[in-house]
């Protein structure tokens, strides 16, 4: 699973996801992509599950690019522990996704295969997404 090799601080504020994506809104690598429509935190496990669904459907044909990286540590307190006594330990890593962000790109497959594969990947994610295609020049 994806996670940073090292970070400056162990814990972060929860934060809010405001506005739309500034960068990463265009297809840069592949012919087809999956674009986020709503803001949400996506965990490293969800990204990995979507990647597996993509590659499994494509049957090792084509190429996949993951355009998001989980760099936000999400902390949680153990179950049945009373409130207080400090913030919990980092539990998992997440990526803050803004609307308009390209999450996955694929290339080297047909339009039908790409659409089906990205639909399967989208089912593994907690956000609404849209299938996008590079406009032929």
Curated annotation (Swiss-Prot):
NCBIfam families with a match to the protein in the record: rplP_bact
Protein name according to UniProt: Large ribosomal subunit protein uL16
Function (record text): Binds 23S rRNA and is also seen to make contacts with the A and possibly P site tRNAs.
Biological source species: Xanthobacter autotrophicus (strain ATCC BAA-1158 / Py2)
Subunit description: Part of the 50S ribosomal subunit.
Family in the record: Belongs to the universal ribosomal protein uL16 family.
Gene from which the chain derives: rplP
GO cellular component, one term: cytosolic large ribosomal subunit
PROSITE patterns recorded: RIBOSOMAL_L16_1, RIBOSOMAL_L16_2
Gene Ontology MF annotations: rRNA binding; structural constituent of ribosome; tRNA binding
Gene Ontology terms describing biological process: translation
InterPro entries linked to this entry: Ribosomal_uL16 (IPR047873), Ribosomal_uL16_bact-type (IPR000114), Ribosomal_uL16_CS (IPR020798), Ribosomal_uL16_dom (IPR016180), Ribosomal_uL16_sf (IPR036920)
